[in-house]
Amino acid sequence: MKKNSIQFTPFEVANDGLTIVVNRHNTWVDDMSVDELRLLWSEDGREKRWSQIHSTWPREQVKFYAPGVDSGTYDYFQNVILQNHRIVKKVSLSEDDQVIMQGVMNDKHAIAFVGYAYYMANRDKVKAIKVNGVFPTKETIQSGKYKPLSRPLLAYVNNASIRNKMNVANYVEFMIQHVGNLAEEVGYVKLRKEKYNEQLRMLTEIKR
């Protein structure tokens, strides 16, 4: 990756899985396809009701909660789910994930998307649903089976700094060796061991 003639290398440090959550008293939603999520979350000028997805679901209006537009979580959801559609106008956006969770907890007809770590921290208070028949777990996120909502978390490092500054190269090596366990401590999913070994080989190539 180049920016203003400066070359950066993205190092994968962990995985995340965007998790679709609903109120724990929601008894009708257990699984949604990507197409259904797109239909529900896309602005089309109508009041959004659950029954628009399945006729057997309630005719109640859906309440939407999501991260702010400056967050990577919002960007990823826009790219892989909404694509070229605009998000619903009646969505409550917040940079505070706890505010989002509180909204879902307090409304039986609420839905939101959050990072896997925030779902895990509140898994006894909200209900996660399957996407395309796959439930978000460490295993399905790590393997990529939970798609398209599994995503890598990246650290971008200046190649010249790696080559010319020993402390930067040492720091990146330390990061690769330890970041998996540190990431899991805060709720993210570490990569497979061979993936970290691949990152170390990439670092060695850059240092030459």
Task: Tell where the protein language model's regions lie, with residue ranges.
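Exported/periplasmic ABC-transporter solute-binding proteins
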Residues: 1-208
